[in-house]
Amino acid sequence: MFVKTGDKVKVIAGSEKGKEGTVLSVNVKKNRVVVKGVNMIKKATKASASNANGGVVETEGSIHASNVKVIAKAESNKD
């Protein structure tokens, strides 16, 4: 896959078009990436020992790898 964890990418298609961020994770089987600060989704969580109140938590959702363009490679990925 052309995108690796740590790369700086720009979203080129979809509702988040134009946003930039760092790749947090890559799912090679599904060809999807999670970009920091892009495609934020809200999840309802129940109260638990680690989260006493529960409530709504915002996390990054995955987007298809074809919708991103690499702007800068991560230092560890430069070949």
Swiss-Prot record:
Family matches, as InterPro entries: KOW, Rib_uL2_dom2, Ribosomal_uL24, Ribosomal_uL24_CS, Ribosomal_uL24_KOW, Translation_prot_SH3-like_sf
Pfam families linked to this entry: KOW, ribosomal_L24
One record GO biological process: translation
Top-level division of the source organism's lineage: Bacteria
Entry GO CC: ribonucleoprotein complex; ribosome
Keywords annotated in UniProt: Ribonucleoprotein, Ribosomal protein, RNA-binding, rRNA-binding
Disulfide linkage: none
SMART domains: KOW
NCBIfam families attached to this UniProt entry: rplX_bact
Quaternary structure (record): Part of the 50S ribosomal subunit.
Homology family: Belongs to the universal ribosomal protein uL24 family.
Protein name per UniProt: Large ribosomal subunit protein uL24
Organism: Lactobacillus delbrueckii subsp. bulgaricus (strain ATCC BAA-365 / Lb-18)
